[in-house]
Amino acid sequence: MNKDDDKEGLAMFSALIDGIKPITQNKRHFRTPLKTKQEIELKEQQLHANSYFSDTYQPLLPVQGPMRWLEEGVDSLELKRLRRGDYQPDLLLDLHGYRQSEAKLELAALIQACVKQQSLCCCIMHGYGSGILKQQVPMWLVQHPMVKAFHQAPKEWGGDAALLVLIDIGEQPHRR
């Protein structure tokens, strides 16, 4: 086949369908598609992340020594247990390579997953150095109502590059 045959065939086809009107569809009325379950869950996660985690809030966190925080009313022994590694994290979140907005969503999803799975402790790896996530993650965790405490992770769970987080899972008996 060459281009002349194609042009000829196209001209013949155009001559055949000249004057034909498309049939209008008047029998079926289409509804707009409903949102999928995944879209709804994503919107809920974004709403939770935005409502819990403010970038402007500056809590009083230690400048020197290991990063740590304990919610008011929680026994200080819990912080010591986190530091020693008595709590084994059930879930691990690695935030390497995430943008700030993505990290917020992942953090909110991790906390929801901990509550859903009745996981008392989780580990969040934010990375070494003085990057933005290393600074922001503790500030976001302080703002979440389900977080009871966090401490810099022991060496086997990431050391300076990670935090062990203690989650309030409700009135269920604690696991270790």
UniProtKB/Swiss-Prot annotation:
InterPro entries registered for this protein in UniProt: Smr_dom, Smr_dom_sf, SmrB-like
Entries under HAMAP family matching the protein: SmrB (MF_01042)
One Pfam family from the record: Smr
Organism the protein comes from: Shewanella baltica (strain OS185)
Record key words, sorted: Endonuclease, Hydrolase, Nuclease, RNA-binding, rRNA-binding
GO biological process: rescue of stalled ribosome
Signal peptide boundaries: none
Similarity-based family: Belongs to the SmrB family.
Protein name: Ribosome rescue factor SmrB
Any one Gene Ontology molecular-function term assigned to this protein's record: RNA endonuclease activity
Domain Smr intervals: 93-168
Domain of life: Bacteria
Quaternary assembly: Associates with collided ribosomes, but not with correctly translating polysomes.
Matching Gene3D superfamilies: 3.30.1370.110
Known function: Acts as a ribosome collision sensor. Detects stalled/collided disomes (pairs of ribosomes where the leading ribosome is stalled and a second ribosome has collided with it) and endonucleolytically cleaves mRNA at the 5' boundary of the stalled ribosome. Stalled/collided disomes form a new interface (primarily via the 30S subunits) that binds SmrB. Cleaved mRNA becomes available for tmRNA ligation, leading to ribosomal subunit dissociation and rescue of stalled ribosomes.
Documented EC number(s): 3.1.-.-
Disulfide linkage: none
